[in-house]
């Protein structure tokens, strides 16, 4: 499990190698949404200042593990 960084901001979310997203603040796994147009799994992440951002799971995994 690795920390998710969005727009160079560290978040309280972690991503696993198989695409599951974990919130360390609530100690729960997030329930993703599948986009009906392209079939990709996405999560809505709340950033530290309260802004929300939709992120695709495959991109989060790539950014976390392919560095």
Model-derived segments and their meaning:
Residues 1-67:
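Conserved recognition-core residues within compact binding domains
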């Amino acid at each position: 499990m690795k920390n998710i960084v969005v727009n160079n901001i560290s978040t309280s979310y972690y991503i696993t190698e198989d695409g599951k997203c974990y919130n360390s603040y609530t100690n729960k796994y997030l329930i993703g949404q599948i986009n009906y147009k392209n079939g990709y799994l996405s999560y809505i992440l709340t950033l530290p200042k309260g802004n929300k951002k939709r992120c695709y799971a495959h991109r989060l995994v790539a950014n976390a593990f392919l560095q």
